[in-house]
Amino acid sequence: MAAKIISGTELSKQIKANLADKITHYIEQGKRAPGLAVILVGADPASQIYVGNKRKSCEEVGILSKSYDLPETTTQNELLAIIDQLNADKNIDGILVQLPLPKQINAEAIIERIDPKKDVDGFHPYNVGRLCQRIPTLRACTPYGVMKLLETTGIDLHGKHAVIVGASNIVGRPMSLELLLAGATVTVTHRFTKNLENHVRQADILVVAVGKPNLISGDWIKESAVVIDVGINRVDGKLVGDVEFDKAAEKAAYITPVPGGVGPMTVAMLMSNTLYAYEHNK
């Protein structure tokens, strides 16, 4: 059985078209456009690509993006001062600081300084805490995007065994909270987990977010599972995920491709969060 492909490219286009319609409606009513501040420190090539994609998406949907391209030598206090300015700026609804940051800057301190109502990445402890308490507002973009992809399958997640490979603050941990909220039974695996294969074989829903090419053998996939591959790795000039795609697709019912799966959804949910922050910016 060949798995159905869950296209993040297609779904993200639909989401962004819907957001663009809403923003056009606000502007026609004489309101200002939503504003997103995008901060990049240093010249990491991957970060530059990600930031470029985010700015391009802002243009597509009608969000005004304000760019801050700062040198690698920027100090923590300099960055905190910019965040304080943006927190006070009534025309800025969302603040995004592209990670990773240079070693002289403490990422946690930066994230905590952002006004939780403008934390469109969904990383602030306040917003993660709200998700944990089952009252989410601004949600981490990648896990939120994964939930939207899972919705397209029509599968009821209640009682399904969801296995997450990777326990990062950006994907794995908030992903576990999203799946719990949806009624799944959740197992989170990480670098100290013994017998990873055994856990993966039990997964009705498998979400992999580690950043190691072909970490998950296609043979491990349970028949008719849903496989969400968050990993993005470059191998021999090609982008590949964390899951051995071809073999996994023979056993799974649904699978996301890399590229064109989770990546576009992360950016779409950032746009969605920015509109949400705009609508609630009082």
Swiss-Prot record:
One GO MF term attached to the UniProt entry: methenyltetrahydrofolate cyclohydrolase activity
Segments forming a coiled coil: none
A Gene Ontology term for the protein's cellular component: cytosol
Alphabetized UniProt keyword annotations: Amino-acid biosynthesis, Histidine biosynthesis, Hydrolase, Methionine biosynthesis, Multifunctional enzyme, NADP, One-carbon metabolism, Oxidoreductase, Purine biosynthesis
Catalytic activities: (6R)-5,10-methylene-5,6,7,8-tetrahydrofolate + NADP(+) = (6R)-5,10-methenyltetrahydrofolate + NADPH; (6R)-5,10-methenyltetrahydrofolate + H2O = (6R)-10-formyltetrahydrofolate + H(+)
Binding, NADP(+): 166-168, 232
GO process annotations (BP): L-histidine biosynthetic process; methionine biosynthetic process; purine nucleotide biosynthetic process; tetrahydrofolate interconversion
EC number per UniProt: 1.5.1.5, 3.5.4.9
Domain of life: Bacteria
NCBIfam families with a match to the protein in the record: PRK10792.1, PRK14186.1
Family label: Belongs to the tetrahydrofolate dehydrogenase/cyclohydrolase family.
Subunit architecture: Homodimer.
UniProt name for this protein: Bifunctional protein FolD
Gene coding for it: folD
